[in-house]
């Protein structure tokens, strides 16, 4: 700091920015110099709000509720892109003049896209800037939503659905963030908060798209989805800090490490497999619900199908509560409970298939059962490999959505062959396989 930083004007010092120091130089009294130097230093050392991109979260040090809430909300809006189409399948089928099987493929392809995004995009969170990955994915998802809204052929919808599914994996970047940076005692709880936002988005997407489809048609829903993605991009820039990467190396080496994790961690394989079959069981009921309710005695429109999504709020509530008790009761017990609940749900769905009360009960039970399995097993995977949380979550969620895609695909074939009873059989089989894996694991551990 030099005396040239200050210029007396009308008997009072005028403080000039330091970058003018080299341009002006003149003499001043020592007293004036000391006083002005003190004032200038007070300006330079004043506490400033640290920019979001300079904030660094520390592992196990805690994460603010504001960031958690933002991640939960954005997770809900982003994952909704994968589920807007479910109540609209009948409208899309009629508008594009395709069969029910072709319309059902939209849901299947979206889930496949999500699985591809989980496998190829989520691991990048250990290698590159997570915030940048999130921004790019939301931008592409917004563009693909516009493509779907303007599509005139089913093949265009299929292609855009594949991409929008792959780019809607943002919540699966948020979940490892919550697991890695939360305090150890709050990890499962905070993962549950983000997961409850994700589930709320799934439920709300079905309700909103059902009503928008009933009143405005199916195309405006995807224009709305594009606008929501742009808003989420702005919120992400303002709220989410950047984070240090967890992996040093190239993308090829990163992907190779996935295979090493698969081979070296049998618990991750088990957790992912049983949760995947459970998710396939849950999606089986949703993938054919629009077709079932369009038949007598319901003859319901897309708005009624969307309203059923509200029944799944039990799953979101369960996710926000289960996290508190996973550490106490263990993953095995939650997996047993979830498998049994799913089988019970499908029995209700079959016996009371011509009743709204029966279908609502089945949806509630199957959602709660699924969340028992997902949250407990997903938390276990992330906590087993905290330094590779994105890759551990990649393996879990890729398997999870492969199971979901398989369940959706099998349910679609079953509907063509035997309508709702055949769909119920598919759901029971998937739930039974999940439960069997848990029982076999329990017997091996006791042996």
For each predicted feature, which ranges?
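Juxtamembrane intracellular "pre-TM" segments in multi-pass secondary transporters
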Residues: 55-61, 241-273
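C-terminal transmembrane helical hairpin of 12-TM major facilitator-type secondary transporters
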Residues: 332-377
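Conserved MFS/SLC helix-loop-helix module at the cytosolic interface between two early adjacent transmembrane helices
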Residues: 116-154
């Amino acid at each position: 700091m030099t005396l040239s930083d200050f210029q007396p004007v009308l008997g009072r010092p005028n403080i000039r920015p330091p970058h003018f120091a080299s341009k002006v130089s003149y003499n001043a009294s020592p007293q004036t110099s000391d006083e002005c130097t003190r004032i200038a230093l007070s300006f330079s050392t004043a506490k400033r709000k640290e920019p979001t991109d300079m904030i660094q979260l520390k592992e196990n040090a805690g994460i603010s509720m504001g960031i958690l809430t933002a991640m939960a909300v954005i997770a809900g809006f982003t994952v909704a892109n994968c589920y807007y189409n479910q109540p609209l399948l009948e409208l899309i089928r009629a508008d594009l003049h395709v069969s029910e099987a072709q319309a059902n493929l939209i849901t299947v392809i979206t889930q496949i896209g999500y699985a591809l995004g989980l496998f190829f995009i989520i691991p990048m969170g250990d290698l590159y800037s997570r915030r940048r990955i999130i921004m790019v994915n939301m931008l592409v998802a917004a563009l693909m939503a516009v493509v779907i809204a303007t599509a005139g052929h089913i093949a265009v919808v299929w292609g855009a659905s594949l991409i929008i599914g792959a780019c809607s994996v943002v919540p699966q970047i948020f979940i490892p963030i919550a697991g890695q940076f939360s305090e150890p005692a709050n990890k499962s709880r905070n993962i549950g908060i983000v997961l409850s936002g994700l589930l709320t988005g799934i439920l709300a997407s079905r309700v909103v798209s059902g009503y928008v489809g009933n009143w405005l048609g199916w195309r405006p829903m995807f224009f709305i989805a594009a606008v929501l993605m742009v808003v989420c991009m702005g919120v992400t820039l303002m709220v989410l800090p950047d984070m240090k990467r967890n992996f040093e190396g190239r993308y090829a080496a990163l992907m190779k490490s996935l295979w090493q994790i698969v081979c070296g961690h049998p618990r991750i394989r088990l957790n992912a497999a049983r949760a995947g079959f459970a998710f396939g069981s849950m999606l089986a009921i949703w993938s054919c619900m629009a077709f079932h309710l369009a038949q007598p005695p319901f003859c319901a429109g897309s708005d009624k199908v969307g309203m059923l999504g509200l029944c799944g709020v039990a799953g979101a509530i369960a996710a926000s509560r289960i996290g508190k008790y996973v550490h106490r009761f263990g993953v095995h017990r939650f997996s047993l409970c979830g498998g049994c609940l799913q089988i019970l749900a499908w029995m209700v769905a079959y016996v009371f298939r011509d009743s709204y009360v029966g279908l609502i009960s089945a949806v509630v039970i199957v959602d709660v059962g699924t969340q028992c399995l997902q949250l407990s097993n997903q938390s276990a995977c992330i906590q087993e490999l905290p330094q590779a949380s994105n890759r551990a979550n990649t393996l879990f969620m890729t398997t999870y959505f492969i199971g979901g895609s398989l369940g959706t695909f099998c349910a679609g074939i079953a509907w063509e062959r035997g309508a709702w009873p055949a769909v119920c059989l598919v759901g029971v089989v998937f739930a039974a396989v999940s439960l069997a894996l848990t029982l076999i694991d329990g017997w091996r551990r006791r042996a």
